[in-house]
């Protein structure tokens, strides 16, 4: 079976894959393969100072050990900086973006909503971040799992950074450009990125890019409420007996694998997942406690 579906898994090499990463990878892989679609891997290595040496290779080796097979070459955002730079220049020339010299201290107390201090200041680009002007509009989309999401960009976000003061490019810009460049039709990822999706919709609209379908899976959280992640020293995935974590990930996604699947090979566990994938079973919630899985 062939399909126009193109999905992707885009890990950040600031650490190794953990169980939360696996849940997102399984969801994106099965959603693509269940309809005969393509599944790409992209390294979101936008922030070299935070990258852990050897993490990129370790991530790819883990995916292989866990039975994942991707299509095409692995793309890296660090190789796409000229494309990002061209769009930043375009937005600056058109007056849709501007230089911002605000420090973190100046922005304390604004709950992450940019108050517009530099919007009409006319600062030079040197030693400044670049922010995108946002409209006083509400953006909405229907997530395949989380349902309708609404966000007023002006009131809830404010003008947001597309290039940092240190010269590195912001995730919001890079992810929109790369998804369009790679022809991604369906984005399956963790619910921690649900809130940033309206900013991406605005960028897509501004740049005349097509809008993918979105599916945000619940985040796996630790007993203290923090998501499983590299920042909280979540343990890396075990190198052996991959079918057991894969089976657990299937259960986290609301699928119903037989108990004996945990003793199978990784490729058999994923093949079962492809054959039985039902995205409507994914829990409609933002978080899932790890201890309940």
Curated annotation (Swiss-Prot):
Q: Where does ATP bind?
A: 230
Give each disulfide bond as a residue pair: none
Please indicate if the UniProt record lists Ligase as a keyword.
yes
Task: Tell me the cofactor note.
Answer: Binds 1 zinc ion per subunit.
Q: Where is this motif: 'HIGH' region?
A: 11-21
Report the transmembrane regions from the record. none
List GO molecular-function terms, semicolon-separated: ATP binding; glutamate-tRNA ligase activity; zinc ion binding
Pfam families (alphabetical): tRNA-synt_1c
Which BP terms does GO give this entry?
Answer: glutamyl-tRNA aminoacylation; tRNA modification
Where can the motif 'KMSKS' region be found? 227-231
- At which positions is L-glutamate bound? 8-12, 44, 171, 189
Which cofactors are named for this entry?
Answer: Zn(2+)
Gene Ontology cellular-component annotations? cytosol
Q: What is the enzyme's class at the highest EC level?
A: ligase
> So what does this one do?
Catalyzes the tRNA-independent activation of glutamate in presence of ATP and the subsequent transfer of glutamate onto a tRNA(Asp). Glutamate is transferred on the 2-amino-5-(4,5-dihydroxy-2-cyclopenten-1-yl) moiety of the queuosine in the wobble position of the QUC anticodon.
Recorded hits in NCBIfam families, A to Z, give:
PRK05710.1-3, queuosine_YadB
Family to which this protein belongs: Belongs to the class-I aminoacyl-tRNA synthetase family. GluQ subfamily.
Q: What is this protein called?
A: Glutamyl-Q tRNA(Asp) synthetase
